Amino acid sequence: MISLLDIRARIADGTLPAADAIRGARERIAAQDPAIGAILRLAPETAVVPEGGPLAGIAVGVKDIIATADMATEYGSDIYAGWRPRADAAIVSRLRALGAVPLAKTATTAFAGLDPAATVNPRDPGHTPGGSSSGSAAAVAAGMLPLALGTQTGGSVIRPAAFCGVAAIKPSFRLLPTVGVKTFSWALDTVGLFGASVADIAHALALIAERPAIEAPAPERPRLALCLQDFAGSADADALAALERAARAAERGGAVVHDLVLPEPFARAWAVHPTVQDFEARQALAWEYAEHRDALPPVLRGQLDRAQDLTAADYDAARREAHRARRQLKELFADVDAILTVSSVGRAPRGLGSTGDARFNRLWTLMGVPCVNVPVPGDGLPLGVQVIARFGDDGRALAVARGIEGALARE
């Protein structure tokens, strides 16, 4: 993989011009992407490459539900074939202001739903890269790009990061702007980042969010709660072994680890995530459903069909459950610095018929808290664990994740 921090260091010391860094990304995409299908289209060759700015020389992949004025934005659907926004999304404008080059639109499932894209997992093309941010995770994993944007409504950043073996963060809700991002669920949709290491995504997030404290170090002896989320079902043996390995690595790095069983309000909140999501999706995609229902892919079409039966009372009750769980989570974090749990049920499923299961992600998306995927090194397809911190404490989540990543690397 290509490190954002390494590129920036080489640009800073004068050994790598920013234009050469962007040219190198174009060359890697041309060489590697035909076998992976992560990239949908590239910015024009004539695009300006800034020589200055804290992210100068950084080529960024932009999930194709995020508007770009210089490239078509099709939302993964033929309904929007060739559609060209008049303006960049706010997050894209921010990247340009920092000197980065939004170089490529990355593959997404249609409207960031569950119907798979054509992208394959660069670790093994016989397996899914996950979704819905399929292309962003795959492009970083394949070493084509040092940074990519994704979005998460259920598990669409953390799960593909785990399947592809890259670092990623789903930040606190609304830390990054969603203006210009196609809405699926306005109470859940969150822009996230993929990178080669936790340090890379921490640096990028600190700059994009204008919060330097995000790169602050972790407490000397962070308190970690090891959580299995039993109400979500069982992870497989490999995922549980990776979680145990990460916990022991954290202890060697100085963390204090104890087990945590989440109380009943969290099980109820987990259960109502689909109600919040689908009630809002029914409205967010109302035009597409009314005018182009038959052009919608089958899983999304069925999801929206079922969502027509949801009532405002169902939605309001679900939101109340979520609010109760958020209050209790705030109290829980008085005694712990971070929660450690699995990122996915297991390794990436075989074939491209499914993007995997978000069961271990969706509670934390509903809670709006920061989640970081930490790859766990090993043989075979990648596995990951997620580090979760209190709302607004993205820096702590990243610092703890960085400590675990380092401890695993020293094994």
Can you name each region flagged by the protein language model?
Residues 1-84, 112-113, 348:
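Short, well-ordered alpha-helical
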Residues 14, 57, 63, 97, ...:
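Glycine-rich, small-residue loops and helix-cap segments
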Residues 18-22, 238-261, 286-291, 315, ...:
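Acyltransferase
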Residues 25, 39, 201, 224, ...:
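Residue-level signal for inorganic ion chemistry
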Residues 55-75, 221, 275-326, 330, ...:
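Short helix-loop capping/hinge segments that flank enzyme active sites or metal/cofactor-binding pockets
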Residues 69-72, 207-272:
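Gly/Ser-rich, acidic/histidine-flanked active-site/gating loops
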Residues 87-205, 370-377, 382-384:
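Short glycine/serine-rich loop segments
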Residues 94, 137-139, 249, 362-365:
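Hydrophobic/aromatic ligand-binding patch that stacks against planar heteroaromatic rings
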